[in-house]
From Swiss-Prot:
Stretches buried in the membrane, not crossing it: 443-463
Record text about domains: The PAL motif is required for normal active site conformation.
Functional description taken from the UniProt entry: Probable catalytic subunit of the gamma-secretase complex, an endoprotease complex that catalyzes the intramembrane cleavage of integral membrane proteins such as Notch receptors. Requires the other members of the gamma-secretase complex to have a protease activity.
Native source organism of the sequence: Dictyostelium discoideum (Social amoeba)
Active site (UniProt): 348, 394
Gene that encodes the chain: psenB
Main location group: endoplasmic reticulum
Gene3D superfamilies xrefs: Presenilin
Localisation: Endoplasmic reticulum membrane; Golgi apparatus membrane
One GO term (biological process): protein processing
Protein name: Presenilin-B
Region (Disordered): 1-141
Family: Belongs to the peptidase A22A family.
């Protein structure tokens, strides 16, 4: 029995599963001693042995099946991984993959293939596959270059198309300013109060600002030169001081100066203007309410010009400042006004076009620093490509010239108005051609003075003669 126990198949199976030990550990020691006692073989024991053998065979078969299924699964996983890697390699090669993977593939092909002809065929096939990719890339690059060229041409076309809108955007505020000045000058010139406000500059002349022949300073060319020289000297000094402050970055002083100047213009000139308008319209108003309105008007103007405000509010206050300044300068004598306009137009040429002119230096400094100039400048569109800037002095002197024409005859007003707009259009055309800062005063002022002279000496007498003769054209 000992030999039978040694050859007992319940000891270990082929896969190392100790089935017999697991069975024996569940039995008690008494059971083990009983089994270890010698007994005769019986058919039941043989049947039990057969059952045990069948169980062992079934377990072995199950283990073999599990191993086979595991092997099949591993082979499937390997095949799937290979397919994935091959797909990745194919996609990588189709998109212009790295040369290292291609080299490894070539080495594997060379090691597997025995003939040199097959290697040559593979190399030629790789070259033939890579050539269309290069041709496609070259074609794509050519298409991109053509599209870029088309884009540049399109930008140029758009800039030319926007030129008309740019002209309209700057002509509209200039026209509004001039028409407002003409309206208020004509309205206030018919009132006796406005004539009394001009008495401090006119001695014995008419209420139109020295157009009569008896005025002391109006017909004196020397006196007009002196007054115009004083005004021009003030303009030069303030411009040079402005450039120096901006050059040395004294921005706090510069903004304080601008705040004070705008407050003075809106406060003093606004007070005089509104008093004249209230008196002309015969509207009573107490001093407290008037002071409150002027204070709010001035503070809102400073905030609207230099602080955060809507673009239309900013533009509105710039137009109001131009109107107030032009109306206040209209009280100067006739010869003084024309002398001042000519001298300022010539100075504008020097200041903008001269290599060391103050305005040219100011523009160059702002371009170098990529900063906006803190000045009273009218902008058509902030932050846009079609942004035009026109100084507030240009608005003032345009309006001053047409206000002087309004004191003579309406025919002078229309002719001067058309001349000023024509000069402004020519200036903007030169700006589009030369693409640099240009003076806006010379062409418009000289054309305006020329048309004013022709209208005053030829057109106005002709219209008056036709009116007296009752001939209407």
């Amino acid at each position: 029995m000992s030999s039978d126990n040694n050859n007992d198949p319940f000891d270990l199976n082929e896969d190392g599963h100790d089935y017999f030990n697991r069975v024996s550990t569940t039995t008690s020691p008494n059971r083990q001693s009983i089994n270890s006692s010698p007994k005769q073989s019986s058919p039941k024991s043989t049947n039990n042995n057969d059952d045990k053998n069948n169980i062992i065979l079934d377990l072995n078969d199950n283990n073999n099946d599990n191993n086979n299924t595991n092997n099949y699964n591993d082979e499937d996983i390997d095949v799937d991984n290979k397919n994935k890697f091959e797909n990745k390699d194919n996609t990588y090669n189709s998109n212009g993959g790295s040369n290292n993977k291609n080299k490894n593939k070539k080495k594997d092909n060379k090691s597997n293939n025995s003939s040199d002809n097959e290697e040559a065929d593979e190399n030629t096939s790789l070259i033939s596959d890579s050539e269309p990719l290069l041709n496609k890339k070259e074609k794509d690059d050519e298409q991109i270059e053509i599209e870029n060229l088309d884009g540049e041409d399109y930008d140029d076309e758009v800039s030319l198309q926007d030129f008309s809108s740019m002209i309209v955007s700057i002509i509209i505020p200039v026209s509004i300013t001039m028409m407002a000045v003409v309206f208020f000058v004509k309205y206030l010139n018919n009132q006796t109060l406005y004539a009394s406000t001009l008495s401090y500059t006119i001695a014995g002349g008419s209420s139109g600002g020295g157009s009569g022949a008896d005025s002391i300073t109006g017909n004196s060319f020397v006196d007009s030169l002196i007054v115009a020289g004083i005004v021009l000297g003030m303009i030069i000094v303030t411009t040079v001081a402005f450039v120096l402050l901006y050059k040395y970055r004294c921005l706090k002083i510069l903004y304080g100066w601008l705040f004070l100047s705008v407050g003075m213009m809106l406060g003093s000139f606004g007070t005089t203007f509104f008093q004249a308008m209230l008196s002309a319209a015969n509207l009573p108003l107490d001093y407290i309410t008037f002071a409150f309105l002027i204070f709010n008007f001035t503070v809102c103007g400073i905030i609207g010009v230099f602080w955060y405000a809507h673009q239309y509010v900013n533009q509105l206050y710039l137009v109001i400042i131009s109107v107030l300044m032009a109306i206040s300068l209209t009280r100067l004598p006739q010869w003084t006004i024309f002398t001042l306009l000519v001298i300022v137009a010539i100075y504008d040429l020097f200041a903008v076009l001269c290599p060391r002119g103050p305005l040219k230096v100011l523009v160059e400094l702002s371009q170098e620093r990529n900063e906006n100039i803190p000045a009273l400048v009218y902008e058509t569109g902030k932050g846009s490509d079609s942004n035009l800037k026109l100084g507030l002095g240009d608005f003032i002197f345009y309006s001053l010239l047409i206000s002087r024409a309004a004191l003579v005859h309406m025919s002078c007003v229309f002719s001067t108005f058309i001349a000023i707009l024509t000069g402004l259009f020519l200036t903007l055309l030169c700006l589009a051609i030369f693409k640099k800062a240009l003076p806006a005063l010379p062409i418009s002022i000289f054309l305006g003075i020329l048309f004013y002279y022709l209208s005053n000496n030829f057109l106005t007498p002709f219209i008056e003669a036709l009116t007296l003769s009752q001939i209407f054209v």
